[in-house]
Amino acid sequence: MSTYHPKSGDITRKWYVIDATDVVLGRLATHAADLLRGKGKPQFAPNVDCGDHVIVINADKVHVSSNKREREMRYRHSGYPGGLKTMTLGRSLEVHPERVVEESIRGMMPHNRLSRASVKKLHVFAGSEHPYAAQKPETYEFKQVAQ
């Protein structure tokens, strides 16, 4: 029997909603990246986009451990000389919480063309409302680790 190679048309995509309230940012990012890549599916192939759509709500209530809100810095550059802008993670979470969550999820993905295509299936919202109710998304539950 020959090896099964999935095609992009054979993949059925599901929609998941992740509530980011009091979830650690890195844990949220790894689970969302795995869903976007389709790592939990039996027909996963690293060269085919077989991931699901992920909706992250309540991005403004995500938990950042330790004192990273004051210590960690976010950088962006305008492209002009002297155009480096810096902002702490806490200030960035106040201004654009959805952008912080998107960047952390994008950082957990491989840095190639396929991941740039699968990141387009990520939808992040600061509040609890989202416009994708017609797709009937399932809620994604995090498994609790015994401490």
UniProtKB/Swiss-Prot annotation:
One of its GO terms (molecular function) is structural constituent of ribosome. This is Large ribosomal subunit protein uL13. Keywords: Ribonucleoprotein, Ribosomal protein. It comes from the Bacteria. This protein is one of the early assembly proteins of the 50S ribosomal subunit, although it is not seen to bind rRNA by itself. It is important during the early stages of 50S assembly. GO terms for biological process: negative regulation of translation; translation. GO terms for cellular component: cytosolic large ribosomal subunit. PANTHER family: LARGE RIBOSOMAL SUBUNIT PROTEIN UL13M, RIBOSOMAL PROTEIN L13. SUPFAM superfamilies: Ribosomal protein L13 (SSF52161). Part of the 50S ribosomal subunit. The keyword Ribosomal protein applies. Pfam families: Ribosomal_L13 (PF00572). Belongs to the universal ribosomal protein uL13 family.
